[in-house]
From Swiss-Prot:
<protein>
    <recommendedName>
        <fullName>Large ribosomal subunit protein uL15</fullName>
    </recommendedName>
</protein>
<feature type="region of interest" description="Disordered">
    <location>
        <begin position="1"/>
        <end position="44"/>
    </location>
</feature>
<dbReference type="GO" id="GO:0006412">
    <property type="term" value="P:translation"/>
</dbReference>
<dbReference type="InterPro" id="IPR001196">
    <property type="entry name" value="Ribosomal_uL15_CS"/>
</dbReference>
<keyword id="KW-0699">rRNA-binding</keyword>
<feature type="compositionally biased region" description="Gly residues">
    <location>
        <begin position="21"/>
        <end position="35"/>
    </location>
</feature>
<dbReference type="InterPro" id="IPR030878">
    <property type="entry name" value="Ribosomal_uL15"/>
</dbReference>
<dbReference type="GO" id="GO:0022625">
    <property type="term" value="C:cytosolic large ribosomal subunit"/>
</dbReference>
<keyword id="KW-0687">Ribonucleoprotein</keyword>
<feature type="compositionally biased region" description="Basic and acidic residues">
    <location>
        <begin position="1"/>
        <end position="13"/>
    </location>
</feature>
<dbReference type="InterPro" id="IPR021131">
    <property type="entry name" value="Ribosomal_uL15/eL18"/>
</dbReference>
<comment type="function">
    <text>Binds to the 23S rRNA.</text>
</comment>
<dbReference type="GO" id="GO:0003735">
    <property type="term" value="F:structural constituent of ribosome"/>
</dbReference>
<dbReference type="InterPro" id="IPR036227">
    <property type="entry name" value="Ribosomal_uL15/eL18_sf"/>
</dbReference>
<keyword id="KW-0694">RNA-binding</keyword>
<keyword id="KW-0689">Ribosomal protein</keyword>
<dbReference type="GO" id="GO:0019843">
    <property type="term" value="F:rRNA binding"/>
</dbReference>
Amino acid sequence: MKLNEIKDNEGSTHSRKRLGRGIGSGSGKTAGRGVKGQKSRSGVAINGFEGGQMPIYRRLPKRGFNNIFASDFVVVSLARIQAAIDAGKLDAKATVDAAALKAAGVIRRAKDGVRVLADGDLKAKITIVVAGASKPAVEKIEKAGGTVTLLSAPAAAE
């Protein structure tokens, strides 16, 4: 068998159905759209329109809001910090902060700061400067001989 001898399986391909090409084609005139009405016209798709029935987005109640002042922290686990130290991407002797975590590829962007959570174990003795840390995370870092410095949140604009 050669590349030029390869053929599709029988019945696997279908020729395109050409619509609106005369009465003899079998799909001329209305081209499979039926007679009159909204769906026979061009540009029919009206997003969210359910034919006059109250649409789902109006049947369901409005809930909640997006707080524009909410702090958006990047969450980092102790396990990921330890993995970066083990891989040689983070220097345990240097101060670990948002810039160091970004340079090591642990986080992509700092947003409003970094929050450390206690998921996993930490063996390295590190000095970490972050915007937030959970109490168990602080305990684990201090148990390993490290220190945690929490940055004060920026004052809200008045």
